[in-house]
Structure formats: structure tokens, C-alpha cells
Amino acid sequence: MSEQVETRLTPRERLTRGLAYSAVGPVDVTRGLLELGVGLGLQSARSTAAGLRRRYREGRLAREVAAAQETLAQELTAAQDVVANLPQALQDARTQRRSKHHLWIFAGIAAAILAGGAVAFSIVRRSSRPEPSPRPPSVEVQPRP
């Protein structure tokens, strides 16, 4: 927490600063008046340009919105056609599926799955039961009383 020491200006420094601001002041005022006249012209030109840009953007935006609405209407019509034809397409798909050839394919797949399950069951069953060793045991199996 440092204290800020405020240095006071001596009378000579105050006079020098005041004269400097007085000498620069009228130039700034003159420049400001000139810029005010030119600035108003520039400001009105900028405002006009901004208005033209805005009108151009709004016109372009309106055209883009109209094109998007037209595209959306076409997509909606296409979707309605698809939905209207959906029951007929489903009926056609069902009649094509009902062939005897597909029935045999499903029966073959079911038989293969059952055979695979039987093989997996026998492998698991054998792994849970230890196989007897062909060698005689090295330790007596029956404990002595």
C-alpha cells in the first residue's frame, strides 16, 4: 500500500501550461469547425451509403427467403408423396418376402445356431470337469486314519 505523492505545479509551470493550451486552442477550434462542415458531408454520405447497403441486403434477403420457401414447398410435396406411397411400398415388400426360399434359409440359420450352441455347451462342460491323468498319483489319495 504505497501512498501516491501529489506534486504541485509551480506558478511558472502553471503559466507555461496555460499559454501552451491557449496557443493550441484556437487552432483546434478552427480545425474542428472545418471538420464539422466536411464531417457533416461525410456523415451524410456514409448514412446514404449505409441506407443503400441496408436496402440491398434486405432485397437480397427477401429473394433468399422466397427461394428457401420455394425449396421447402418442393421438399414438403416430395415428402407427402413418399408418405402417401408408403403403404403400397410396404405391401409390395411383404409380398416379395413371402417366398419358400427364404423359409429354407431361416431354417438353415436356425440349425447352424443350434449346432453351434451344442458345441459350445460340450466345450464348457468338458472344461469344468478335469480329465483324469494317465499317470498314477504321486501322493496317496486316501488319507490314513
From Swiss-Prot:
Membrane topology summary: Single-pass membrane protein
InterPro entries, per the entry: CwsA
Domain of life: Bacteria
Alphabetical GO biological process terms: cell division; cell wall biogenesis; regulation of cell shape
Keyword Membrane recorded: yes
Alphabetical keyword list: Cell cycle, Cell division, Cell membrane, Cell shape, Membrane, Transmembrane, Transmembrane helix
Segments traversing the membrane: 104-124
Subcellular location: Cell membrane
Keyword Cell cycle: yes
CC per GO annotation: plasma membrane
Family statement: Belongs to the CwsA family.
Function per UniProt: Required for regulated cell division, cell wall synthesis and the maintenance of cell shape.
The protein's name in its UniProt record: Cell wall synthesis protein CwsA
UniProt organism field: Mycobacterium bovis (strain ATCC BAA-935 / AF2122/97)
Species classification: Bacteria, Bacillati, Actinomycetota, Actinomycetes, Mycobacteriales
Recorded name of the encoding gene: cwsA
